[in-house]
A protein has these predicted regions:
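Noncatalytic scaffold domains of N-terminal-nucleophile
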Residues: 1-24, 28, 36-193
């Protein structure tokens, strides 16, 4: 049986991510002398920028690290709901669904997970590994088909929130495939971190 994609070979490093710019960020970190943890964190942060409809920098980032001796370390990277939220609230009041809005929000855990991984096993600082993600957010990247489709499907939701509308509906309209998608506030936040 033949694979639908070609087998790729290399002699120095290999990375894989859900967006080619995130993979480029990880590869650049490895080329600069970083290790796999540095590259993984760089890719995770970049995915929060390049896949904003799937991944969120202020979301979750569970991390599994397999060490050279074969042991595995986990960094939970999972956010929590406030203690005041009853465990059965979503079943009782929302039919088992988590509604849009503040009830969907957990305490952001991804930044802590990345920083913890870098402190324990990395060779680079958060600022060094976040450089590409900051650049992608600040300067933008080309809108791709899935992002354009997801923005179209969620247009009404984005329009409801004054913090989301200028990002996902710049100038009051959906960005088209190939247009530049900029997240200046996210770039400033990552730069501050």
């Amino acid at each position: 049986m033949h694979a639908t994609r070609p087998t790729l070979y290399g002699t120095r490093h290999a990375v894989s991510a859900g967006h080619y710019l995130a993979a480029a960020a990880g590869f650049a970190v490895l080329e600069a002398g970083g290790n796999a943890i540095d590259a993984g964190c760089a890719m995770g942060i970049a995915l929060g920028v390049t896949l904003p409809d799937f991944v969120n920098v202020a979301g979750v980032a569970p991390i599994l690290i397999r060490k050279a001796d074969g042991t595995v370390e986990t960094i939970a990277g999972l956010g929590h709901w406030p203690r005041s939220i009853p465990a059965d609230l979503f079943m009782r009041e929302h039919g088992g669904r988590i509604p849009n809005g503040v009830l969907r929000t957990v305490v952001p855990a991804a930044p802590d997970a990345w920083i913890t991984a870098l402190e324990r096993h990395g060779t680079m600082s958060f600022g060094e590994v976040a450089g590409a993600a900051i650049r992608y957010a600040r300067d933008g990247f080309a809108v791709y088909g899935i992002l354009a489709d997801n923005i179209r499907e969620r247009e009404a939701d984005y329009a409801r929130y004054p913090g989301s509308a200028p990002i996902f509906l710049p100038g009051g309209r959906r960005p088209e495939v190939g247009e530049t998608f900029v997240q200046a506030d996210l770039a400033r936040t990552l730069q501050h971190m």
